[in-house]
Swiss-Prot record:
It comes from the Archaea. The active site is at S88. GO terms for biological process: carbohydrate metabolic process. It comes from Methanococcus aeolicus (strain ATCC BAA-1280 / DSM 17508 / OCM 812 / Nankai-3). This is Phosphoglucosamine mutase. Pfam families: PGM_PMM_I, PGM_PMM_II, PGM_PMM_III, PGM_PMM_IV.
Length: 452
């Protein structure tokens, strides 16, 4: 696809022309649309162009303003579909457009392809006359409806101390308030709206969260009362990463394992959904519960689709900080996930670091290798054809090529948005991990040299 990547449209300097075309294409399939946006400086520009396209095709619009993506996803249930203007964790010069179904799930690739077909093939294009233009309504109650819904979905009786870092983005309008509403003592960091993300870059990783991590460590050094933990969001608060009482950023894979165990023990579910790039620690950590871990393609769309295939599956996540709680709603929700983290700590009566440190730790290595887009198919065909002999393991082609060994695994998959092929390995020790990575890199390079 020309416009849509693995998570909607995201690009540097997204133009009003593209926003108009997307809006017009959407108007051909939906006549009642709810729209939200994050705090980026180009948000109004993109919104107005999107609105022009929607109106030109006869759609009615409900604007809910600056909201987290999970608020938009929750609100979509009352309309034909939802549109979120956001570039998620990307820097401030980026913006994007993400489309949502009524059930809160993101558009699937075939739905996005249909939008592109309308744009580029001028398929089913119909403009309305001047006297059929619909209205743009404003719903200032959407955020409160979402907040009330989330508060009704969690039960937290213990008093916690939480530092909430919203990256000056959409989470600012909801996350600190909801943590306060459940009785937590909250310190808000980067908690005012600023589309330049002046406090930190919106991707919640170790580099960008250094100040918040040091703050939590300092707060707890001489604190004999409740120890602070940290909750950090990306640019639209559909993701969440936690910082433990020692000021350490929690590993995404370990957090996924802990969440999965909590949901299994609390609800009795025997099915957990995750992606092909998640750690084997999750199977190890859940082994005594006889939980079936089902792996799917990378991306929240694939996780939510797989959740819907299994009635007993109520939780899924991926090691990017994306957590989906099907028993509540199907949109990835960083705020709900942060609150459920408090629920989990209360359930086990343990500190966060105690829960995280209980998860097995394996050696992880990764590398990304330059690969022109027109060579990706050739390279992956070569990897799939030759990888089983190289690794002495059967290949799984759910998403890229994954080789599972007794003491580790290798995942080789092409980037959906960049001219790279990524190699990720995990093993029970550093020596095995290094050997697997070297084999994976050589396999990709040999594929690049393959002539067809």
């Amino acid at each position: 696809m020309k416009l849509f990547g693995t998570s909607g449209i995201r690009m540097k300097n997204l133009t009003p022309e593209i926003a108009y075309k997307v809006g017009f294409a959407v108007s051909q399939i939906a006549k009642n649309v709810v729209v939200g946006r994050d705090t980026r400086t180009t948000g109004d520009l993109i919104r107005n162009s999107l609105f022009a396209g929607l109106l030109n095709g006869g759609a009615e619009i409900v604007d809910i303003g600056i909201v987290p993506t999970p608020t938009l996803g929750y609100s979509a249930r009352n309309y034909d579909m939802g549109i979120m203007i956001t570039a998620s964790h990307n820097p401030s010069e980026y913006n994007g457009i993400k489309l949502f179904n009524k059930d809160g799930t993101s558009f699937r690739p075939e739905q996005e392809q249909n939008i592109e077909d309308i744009i580029y093939n001028k398929k089913n294009q119909k403009r309305v006359s001047w006297n059929s233009i619909k209205k743009v309504w404003t719903d200032e109650s959407a955020l409160k409806k979402y907040s009330d819904f989330i508060l009704d979905s969690v039960e937290i009786n213990k008093n916690f101390s939480v530092v909430v870092d919203c990256a000056n983005s959409a989470g600012c309008v909801a996350s600190p308030y909801l943590f306060t509403d459940v009785g937590a003592h909250v310190i808000s960091v980067n908690g005012h709206i600023d589309g330049r993300f002046i406090g930190r870059s919106p991707e919640p990783n170790e580099k960008n969260l250094q100040d918040t991590m040091h703050m939590i460590k300092g707060l707890n050094e001489n604190n004999k009362g409740n120890k602070y933990i940290g909750i950090a969001h990306d640019g639209d608060a559909d993701r969440m990463i936690a910082i433990d009482e020692k000021g350490r950023l929690t590993d995404f894979d370990k957090l996924l394992a802990v969440f999965s165990r909590y949901m299994a023990e609390k609800t009795g579910t025997k099915t957990i959904i995750t992606t092909v790039d998640a750690s084997m620690a999750i199977e190890e950590y859940l082994k005594d519960l006889n939980v079936n871990v089902i792996r799917t393609k990378v991306g929240d769309v694939a996780v939510s689709d797989e959740l819907n295939k299994h009635d007993d599956a109520i939780f899924g996540g991926e090691p990017s900080g994306t957590w989906i709680h099907k028993d509540i709603h199907l949109t990835p929700d960083g705020i709900l996930s942060g609150l459920r983290l408090l629920e989990m700590m209360e359930f086990y009566d343990k500190k966060l670091y105690e829960l995280i440190d209980d998860v097995p730790c394996y050696s992880n290595l990764r590398e990304k290798l330059p690969c022109p887009d027109d060579k990706k198919i050739i390279v992956m065909d070569f990897v799939i054809k030759n990888g089983e002999n190289i690794f002495d393991a059967e290949v799984e082609t759910i998403d890229g090529a994954r080789f599972s060994l007794d003491d580790g695994w290798v995942l080789i998959r092409p980037s959906g948005t960049e001219p790279f092929v990524r190699v990720r390995v995990e093993a029970k020790n550093d020596i095995i991990a290094k050997e697997l990575l070297e084999k994976g890199i050589k396999l990709v390079k040999d594929g690049l040299n393959e002539k067809k």
